[in-house]
């Protein structure tokens, strides 16, 4: 338990540094930023305690907010994604993660993985962009910006997942 918690904290620090030092300096067309740090939450084991998951989400989101000076926007978006993560796993796997303590998350098909990643990254980008703008008159511009950011984040996430494949049973 303690060893896995320490490993998760180390992984969280890695994603914070990756986001802050590399991906915060990438701005596509002055329009969209990739948010790769969300992979920390998306790749945590499905058996992770719900409260620990929300705590990890708040911690990584808050750390990104501190470095980006965004006043809680990333913390909100990351906690929202963490909150919606298990219900989406339940929906995609036809199993209840809360009852079983574990799921067939590691055995997701490519389509299930794709839906899981796309939906949660899109939710993250939409929530960040909507809160940052606080305007509805540019709604379609916000949606366009979110879709471009989501696409870039998904491509970078796929590169990361293919470069560092998760362990089948213990990692995810």
Task: Specify the residue positions occupied by each region the protein language model found.
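Terminal, non-globular segments
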Residues: 1-172
């Amino acid at each position: 338990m303690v060893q896995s918690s320490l490993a998760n904290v180390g992984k969280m620090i890695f994603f914070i540094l990756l986001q802050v030092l590399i991906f915060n300096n990438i701005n596509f067309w002055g329009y969209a930023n990739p948010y790769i740090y969300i992979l920390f939450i998306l790749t945590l084991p499905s058996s992770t305690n719900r409260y620990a998951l929300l705590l990890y989400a708040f911690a990584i989101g808050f750390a990104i907010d501190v470095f980006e000076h965004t006043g809680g926007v990333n913390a909100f978006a990351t906690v929202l994604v963490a909150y919606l993560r298990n219900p989406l796993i339940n929906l995609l796997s036809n199993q209840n993660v809360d009852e079983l303590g574990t799921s067939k998350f590691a055995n997701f098909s490519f389509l299930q993985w794709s839906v899981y990643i796309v939906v949660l990254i899109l939710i993250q980008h939409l929530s960040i962009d909507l809160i940052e703008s606080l305007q509805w008159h540019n709604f379609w511009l916000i949606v366009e910006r979110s879709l471009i950011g989501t696409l870039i984040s998904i491509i970078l996430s796929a590169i990361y997942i293919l470069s560092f494949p998760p362990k089948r049973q213990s990692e995810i």
